[in-house]
Structures are given as C-alpha cells and as structure tokens.
Swiss-Prot record:
The keyword Glycosyltransferase applies. It catalyses: 5,6-dimethylbenzimidazole + nicotinate beta-D-ribonucleotide = alpha-ribazole 5'-phosphate + nicotinate + H(+). It comes from Shewanella sp. (strain ANA-3). GO terms for biological process: cobalamin biosynthetic process. Belongs to the CobT family. Pathway: Nucleoside biosynthesis; alpha-ribazole biosynthesis; alpha-ribazole from 5,6-dimethylbenzimidazole: step 1/2. Catalyzes the synthesis of alpha-ribazole-5'-phosphate from nicotinate mononucleotide (NAMN) and 5,6-dimethylbenzimidazole (DMB). Its EC number is 2.4.2.21. This is Nicotinate-nucleotide--dimethylbenzimidazole phosphoribosyltransferase. The gene is cobT. Signal peptide: none annotated. Pfam families: DBI_PRT. The active site is at E317. CDD domains: DMB-PRT_CobT.
Length: 350
C-alpha cells in the first residue's frame, strides 16, 4: 500500500481582535504607522498567538540538505560533492549560518534529506534521507509521489518534536547544489510562467550555463506537463528532497500555529507549494528577505509578501531568515513593552 499523504489541518488566523490589536499598536508613544513594517509584523504575530503578550520561544533554524540529479548537467558553478562538504562544514560550525545562529540565539539543526553520500559520524546532522539525490528532472520524475508523502510525514514528525520542546518560531534554510534549477522549475509550473522569468544565475553561473539551465528546465516542464495535476505531483516531478521536506515542515508548523520564517528563493518555492496545498499556511509565513535570484521578486509578489530585508543575499542556508530574527523580536518587544500615551502621560498624536 502506498503511504498516505499527511493531512494538515491548518486554521486561518482569526481577525476578530484586529481592531483591539491595532488600537494597542496605534496608542503606543509614536505617530500611527511610525514603526512601519514592524507594526504590520506585530499585527500578524498577535493574530497568530492570540495573546496580550507576544513571545518568541526557542527559535529554531532548520537547514534541509539534498542533492539534485540535474546538477550532473553542469547547471551550477559547483559540483554535487560540495553539498556534502557544506553539510560537513555545518556540522563543524564553520558556515555562515552557524555564525549567525550563534550570534542571534537560534537553535540550529541540519537535516540530511538525501545528499549523494551521507556524512559519517557528524554530530547534529539529522538523518531523514529519502534517497541518494533526486533523479534528473529533464529525463524522469525527481521522485515518486510516495516519496513526497514520506518526506511530508518525516517533516511533520520533525516539527512535532520541536513543538513539543516549546519552540514557537521555526526558520527554514537549505543546501543543495542544483536546487535553484528545481525551485525555478516549480515556480514556472505553479505560477504558469515562462522559464526565462524564473531562472537566475544561482551561485553565479555565466551566460552559457544559464542558457543550458533554462533549456533543461524547459525540457523538464514539457516532459512532465501531463503528470503535474497538483502541487504534490509538481514536487514529485520537479522537486528536491530538501524542498519536499521544507514544504511539509512549513505546513506542519502552520498547523501548530508556529511562526514560519522563510529564507530566500528555494525556501520561497517550498512556501509556494505549501500555499498551493493549503492556502491558510500563508497567514503564518514571515518572509525574511528579497534575494538576488531574479525570480524571487515574482514569487514574493505572487504570495503578496513584503520581505523584511533586502541585502543582496544569494547564499541560502537560511542566512537571511537568521538575520531577520532581531526584527521579529523587535516587533514583539515594542508591542509588549512600549508605553502607551496614557501610560506615559503624553498627549496622543493624531
């Protein structure tokens, strides 16, 4: 029997208290709207948490790693072996995401979703392997639909473990040579766009490689057109093991009313699939930054997302999501701690 797909029961956030929440924000000692995007962020968090005092508890960064069959076609400046080497680097604490998580107070967990060769005896690497890299999407489906469902179930268990530990904010990063190709293909399929509008230079490929990358994605979309009857099928045809598990984890986190912080292009592609599966997940998504990958802005617009940062990042790993945490904490803190006009004995600014 094939594994059944996990059912995600995601409630939309309630807007019943919006007037009271907005009034609390507006009566802080500042002109209305003066804290800009932090105010809309505080409103979003207050809707999710439904509490008088907002909080961030045990913020956790999950970095999902997987390899891609299409990488063998030279669509990236780096070979697939670099995925494993970077996972080792994560385990040794030497990557940018390690540095930022230490600085900012994130609990970091790295999940091997299916790199070509597992890292042996690596402390802190969680084994959730779905295979040794996906198939090449321009030649065959990346994986089976049963594999997608297994990845969702694994992701659901992962999120439940962190939720049981008290975590209420989870951020998403990734590592996988070739995964911008998979993400661009997913974007083109779901948003019904030309591949040229979705494909970017990833880690910095030249124009010749960019043309080859675009051609291979076009072949993949043509090959799987009839099979892509829904978002799970899109993942099976075009996805990466890490994108599958990110998608499932976002759905599971929203189901548990956790804050979901989305990193860059790859993580946003996972969010795009998650929203296609259950539109209510969108209420729980906080988009950390606008990356340099050219398709990212289009996806953000499609998801009606206004990212917190725009720093020219194109690294992945969850680095942008990590850097957004102080802003999220600032939104929580001003909401909880900032005096109202009446508290401070100041005449209200109209």
């Amino acid at each position: 029997m094939p594994q059944s797909v996990p059912l995600f029961q995601i409630e939309p956030v309630s807007k019943a208290q919006d007037q009271l929440i907005q009034q609390k924000i507006d009566l802080k000692t500042k002109p209305p709207g003066a804290l800009g995007q932090l105010e809309s962020l505080a409103l979003q968090i207050a809707r999710i948490q439904g509490a008088k005092q907002l909080q961030i508890v045990y913020p956790t960064m999950l970095v999902f790693a997987g390899d891609h069959g299409i990488a063998a076609e030279g669509v990236s400046i780096a070979p697939s072996e670099v995925t494993r080497q970077m996972v080792q680097n994560f385990a040794h604490g030497g990557a940018a995401i390690n540095v930022f998580c230490r600085q900012l107070g994130f609990n970091l967990e790295v999940i091997d979703c299916g790199i070509l060769t597992p890292v042996e005896d690596a402390e802190g690497i969680i084994d959730q392997r779905l295979g040794a890299g996906t198939a090449a999407i321009h030649l065959e489906p990346a994986m089976t639909l049963a594999c997608v469902d297994k990845g969702f179930a694994m992701a659901q268990a992962l999120i439940e473990r962190h939720h049981q530990a008290g975590c209420n904010l989870v951020a998403f990063g990734e590592m996988g040579i070739g995964n911008t190709s998979s993400a661009a293909a997913i974007m083109a399929a779901i948003m019904q766009l030309d591949v040229a509008d979705c494909v970017g230079r990833g880690t910095g490929i030249n124009s010749e490689t960019l043309e080859r990358k675009q051609m291979l994605i076009e072949l993949a979309l043509l090959l799987h057109q009839s099979a892509m009857t829904g978002p799970r099928q899109v993942l099976a045809c075009l996805g990466g093991f890490e994108i599958v598990q990110m998608t499932g984890a976002m759905l599971a986190a929203a189901e548990r009313k956790m804050l979901v912080v989305v990193d860059g292009f790859i993580a946003t592609a996972a969010a795009l699939v998650a929203v296609s599966i259950n539109a209510n997940v969108r209420d729980y998504l906080i988009f950390a930054h606008r990356s340099e990958e050219q398709g990212h802005q289009r996806m953000l617009e499609h998801l009606k997302a206004k990212p917190l940062l725009s720093l020219g990042l194109r690294l992945g790993e969850g680095t942008g999501a990590a850097l957004a945490l102080p802003l999220i904490q600032a939104a929580v803190n001003f909401y909880n701690q900032m005096a109202s006009f009446s508290d401070a004995g100041i005449e209200a600014v109209v």
